[in-house]
Design a protein with these regions (language model features):
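N-terminal amphipathic/basic-hydrophobic helices that include classical n-h-c signal peptides
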Residues: 1-11
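Conserved RNA-binding domains used in RNP assembly and mRNA/RNA metabolism
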Residues: 9, 13-105
C-alpha cells in the first residue's frame, strides 16, 4: 500500500480560490476588470478633421460577474447577503467587451 501523505486530503477539500470573490446564498461570484467600448455622441458641428478623430470611449468597469452567455455579460457591484439582492447592475453585449480579467486576491 502507498504511504498516506499527511495534509493532502485537507488541502484538496479546503482549497481556497486565489481570485477575489463573494459567496451569496449558495453561489460564488468572481470579481473582474472589464475593458469595453462605448458609443460617443456629439450633436455639434465638426470639420472633416475633427470627425476623422472621433472615436468610441474606452471604458473600464470593476464588478462581480452575475452570469455570462454567448451574447451578454451581467454584472453587479453591490449586494445584500441577507435578502440576496443585487445593486449597481449592468448588462454588456459581448461584442462591446475588449478584455475580461479575473482579479487576484
Amino acid at each position: 500500500f502507498p504511504k498516506p501523505v499527511l495534509g493532502k486530503i485537507d488541502s484538496m477539500v479546503n482549497k481556497k480560490s486565489k481570485y477575489r470573490h463573494v459567496k451569496i446564498g449558495s453561489k460564488t461570484y468572481y470579481f473582474y476588470r472589464l475593458e469595453w467600448v462605448d458609443i460617443t455622441g456629439d450633436a455639434g458641428h465638426a470639420s472633416v478633421e475633427e470627425f476623422d478623430k472621433f472615436e468610441c470611449s474606452k471604458m473600464i468597469t470593476h464588478a462581480y460577474i452575475y452570469k455570462k452567455t454567448s451574447k451578454f455579460v451581467w454584472t453587479f457591484a453591490s449586494y445584500e447577503e441577507k435578502d440576496v439582492s443585487f445593486s449597481d447592475r449592468n448588462i454588456f453585449p459581448v461584442g462591446c467587451i475588449v478584455k475580461m480579467e479575473r482579479i487576484l486576491l
